Curated annotation (Swiss-Prot):
The gene is capA. It comes from the Bacteria. SUPFAM superfamilies: Nucleic acid-binding proteins (SSF50249). Keywords: Activator, Cytoplasm, DNA-binding, Stress response, Transcription, Transcription regulation. InterPro entries: Cold_shock_CspA (IPR012156), CSD (IPR011129), CSD_CS (IPR019844), CSP_DNA-bd (IPR002059), NA-bd_OB-fold (IPR012340). This is Cold shock protein CapA. It comes from Pseudomonas fragi.
Amino acid sequence: MSQRQSGTVKWFNDEKGFGFITPQGGGDDLFVHFKAIESDGFKSLKEGQTVSFVAEKGQKGMQA
């Protein structure tokens, strides 16, 4: 199991339900889908928001 990391939301599109996170330690941006957001109610992220995540390999590369 991967370790939890921190990062910043680069952008998130509410209508499409996905966006990208820039890891705090550097590296490639990670795809994030609204289904992966651990939150009650409407699942969205704001540009510039600090988040914690676990990176894992998805169908098209690494994702949060």
